[in-house]
């Protein structure tokens, strides 16, 4: 049976889509979404999707989200039985979302809220794991904006990006424990480490735990290595061998891999879906 990709469309109308990457067949699951869906995760065994929302722009076409109206919801893979898991002022701007199916946790970033969250996949036990700044006073400091997230359950780590200003060359990938250290708060964790720094503008993350490889998209300046797919290898707790695997993204965002077929798919703000071969490498192929 062909595998499906679940995609989010923001403009001109918010939609949740299902794409067959082998034949290009596209199906709309949900339409009419008004609050900018951004992150999506699949629980294949339960047949459910999880979606984060950025909320409403402060003014039309501003692409600024400085009000606490982000949301997190779940639904079936057919777009039915929609349930609100978090919202009502709890966070500001929902970004990348990942699901730990084995332990029933959701992890996501709150960009303008400058935080990293987790909650059970029924919405319970909501916790702020990282707080990089104070909302709203520091929300326009883009070096504090948390965007992409990935987890390494084997070693008990969470990773996230703080992308920095557009094309600014100040992006970072950071790491901390999956749980708060005893006696610590989200805004003063002693276990936070910067594992990659001075990146053009890192966005979303994908961690291959079996291979020990971190992948990420970057939409920084082309001349500095932006608009690219990147990787680095985890060796003895440190990331080495940073490589730019492919270029040509039009402001890259999401990525997801299928190690069984040796493929990765990526999306960008240009409305493209790209395929990359993890086995042979080579250029991106537009689907």
For the regions a language model picked out, list residue spans one by one.
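Short, conserved, GDST-rich strand-edge loop motifs in beta-rich repeat architectures
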Residues: 5-8, 52-69, 161-172, 217-225
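A short loop-to-beta-strand structural motif that recurs across blades of beta-propeller domains
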Residues: 15-17, 61-64, 70-73, 115-118, ...
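Blade-level signature of beta-propeller repeat domains, shared across WD40, Kelch, NHL, RCC1
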Residues: 267-287
């Amino acid at each position: 049976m062909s595998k499906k990709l679940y995609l989010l469309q923001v403009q001109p109308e918010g939609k949740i889509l299902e794409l067959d990457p082998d034949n290009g067949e596209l199906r709309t699951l949900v339409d009419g979404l008004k609050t900018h869906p951004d992150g999506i995760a699949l629980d294949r065994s339960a047949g459910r999707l999880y979606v984060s929302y950025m909320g409403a722009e402060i003014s039309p076409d501003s692409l600024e989200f400085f009000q606490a109206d982000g949301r997190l919801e779940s639904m079936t893979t057919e777009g039915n039985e929609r349930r609100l898991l978090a919202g009502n002022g709890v966070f500001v701007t929902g970004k990348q979302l990942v699901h730990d199916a084995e332990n029933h946790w959701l992890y996501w970033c709150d960009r303008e809220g400058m935080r990293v969250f987790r909650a059970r996949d029924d919405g319970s036990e909501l916790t702020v794991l990282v707080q990089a700044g104070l909302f709203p006073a520091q929300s326009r400091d883009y070096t504090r904006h948390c965007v992409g997230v990935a987890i390494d359950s084997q070693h008990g780590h969470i990773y996230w990006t703080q992308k920095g200003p557009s094309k600014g060359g100040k992006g970072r990938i950071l790491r901390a424990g999956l749980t708060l250290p005893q006696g610590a708060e989200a805004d003063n964790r002693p276990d936070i480490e910067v594992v990659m720094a001075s990146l053009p503008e890192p966005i979303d993350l994908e961690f291959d735990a079996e291979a020990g490889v971190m992948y990420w998209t970057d939409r920084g300046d082309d001349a500095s290595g932006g608009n690219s797919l990147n990787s680095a290898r985890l060796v003895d707790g440190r990331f080495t061998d940073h490589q730019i695997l492919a270029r040509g993204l039009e402001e890259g965002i999401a990525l997801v891999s299928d190690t069984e077929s040796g493929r990765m798919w990526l999306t960008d703000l240009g409305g493209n879906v790209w395929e990359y071969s993890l086995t042979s490498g080579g250029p991106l192929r537009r689907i």
